[in-house]
Each structure stands twice: as structure tokens, then as C-alpha cells.
From Swiss-Prot:
Functional summary from the UniProt entry: Catalyzes the transfer of an acyl group from acyl-phosphate (acyl-PO(4)) to glycerol-3-phosphate (G3P) to form lysophosphatidic acid (LPA). This enzyme utilizes acyl-phosphate as fatty acyl donor, but not acyl-CoA or acyl-ACP.
Entry superkingdom: Bacteria
Source organism: Rhodopseudomonas palustris (strain HaA2)
Keywords: Cell inner membrane, Cell membrane, Lipid biosynthesis, Lipid metabolism, Membrane, Phospholipid biosynthesis, Phospholipid metabolism, Transferase, Transmembrane, Transmembrane helix
Gene from which the chain derives: plsY
Single GO cellular component term: plasma membrane
Chain segments annotated as transmembrane: 5-25, 54-74, 80-100, 112-132, 153-173
HAMAP family in UniProt: PlsY
Entry protein name: Glycerol-3-phosphate acyltransferase
Disulfide bonds: none
Length: 197
């Protein structure tokens, strides 16, 4: 019975996470295919490169909310363990959506969204770290990497070892998805916030 619940939670999370809101919103707005501009990513940062700040904000919000919703729904029928599996599923769904031949986003908004659903103070810490790094360095990718690196440590320090383990895995995946950004940061060629590629 529990195995069935856990599988359902993982699949629920994956299906929620795989909804490509950035692509959907930009198509509705009549902009060019998001995958053909900037980084080719379907997330909010690349939507911002279209010059449509409202669309970028909506993408960020909806990508976060799909993670939060998956966690809350899974928690309602399967408890904390199911919620964590839904979080993992949502993150994987965003990174590797079946609808887009498994080529999705980099996961920052969904990371925040599932963190809101599982332990909202952690999401506040993540956002504050992101903001502080963004203000000082003006690199969206670096801001996300710094915040994601510290988040599992914060969760462990405040007595949530299971969540710390989950977010350590999510952080590793997030770093992998940002591997090209890391190379550009090292080379000094990464685009700053507000710049078009």
C-alpha cells in the first residue's frame, strides 16, 4: 500500500513539474519560441531575455507554485515521505519533461516551490541568499548556486536531516544543470541580470 502511495506521489510530482509554463506563456503572448533565444532554456531567466518582465515574473511564480502544489497534494494523501517524493518528482519533471523530449529548465523556481511546501523558512533563506548575491554580483546563475549550496546546510543545522538529504540531491542536480553557466562564470563570459545574450 505504501509503495503504491509513494509511486503515486512521485508520478504526481513529475507530471506537475513537467508543465512548461515559460514556453506556454510566451507562446500565448506571441513571442518567438523560447527555445530559440538566449540560453534556449524554458525558465524565467530566459523569458526575461524576451524583454517581457511580466511574463518572466509569471513564469517564475507558476514554476514555483507547481512544485508547492505537488508537495501539498502528496502530503494530504501520503504524509511527509510522499511530500518529499513529490518534491523530487516535480524537480525531475521540470528538468526532464516528457513533453519536450526531456529538455526542460534548470530548476531554480521549482526548487524554491518545493521548499515552500516542505519547509517555508528554508525558502525565505534561499530567496534572501539569492537576492544578496544578485545585488552584489548581478549573476542570476551564481545567485542560485550560492543559495542552493547553503540551503541543505541550513536544513541540517536546524534539525531537518531528511530534508537536508533531499535538497543536497536537488542541489547536485541543479549544479549539473548549470554546468555551462559555471564554465562561463569561470571564463568571465556569463550574462549579468538584465543583459540579453
Amino acid at each position: 500500500m505504501l509503495i503504491g502511495i509513494y509511486i503515486a506521489a512521485l508520478l504526481l510530482g513529475y507530471l506537475f513539474g513537467s508543465i512548461p509554463f515559460g514556453l506556454i506563456l510566451t507562446k500565448i503572448a506571441g513571442t518567438e519560441d523560447l527555445r530559440s533565444i538566449g540560453s534556449g532554456n524554458i525558465g524565467a531567466t530566459n523569458v526575461l531575455r524576451t524583454g517581457r518582465k511580466g511574463l518572466a515574473a509569471a513564469t517564475l511564480l507558476l514554476d514555483a507554485l507547481k512544485g508547492t502544489a505537488a508537495v501539498i497534494i502528496a502530503s494530504s494523501f501520503g504524509g511527509a515521505e510522499a511530500a518529499m517524493l513529490a518534491a523530487l518528482g516535480a524537480f525531475l519533471g521540470h528538468l526532464f519533461p516528457v513533453w519536450l523530449k526531456f529538455k526542460g529548465g534548470k530548476g531554480v523556481a521549482v526548487y524554491i516551490g518545493v521548499l515552500i511546501g516542505l519547509f517555508w523558512p528554508g525558502a525565505i533563506v534561499f530567496c534572501l541568499l539569492w537576492l544578496a548575491t544578485a545585488v552584489t554580483a548581478r549573476y542570476s546563475s551564481l545567485s542560485a548556486l550560492v543559495a542552493a549550496f547553503i540551503t541543505p546546510i541550513f536544513l541540517w543545522w536546524f534539525g531537518h536531516p531528511a530534508l537536508a538529504s533531499l535538497f543536497a540531491v536537488l542541489t547536485l542536480l541543479l549544479f549539473w544543470m548549470h554546468r555551462e553557466n559555471i564554465k562561463r562564470l569561470q571564463a568571465g563570459t556569463e550574462s549579468k541580470i538584465g543583459e540579453k545574450k
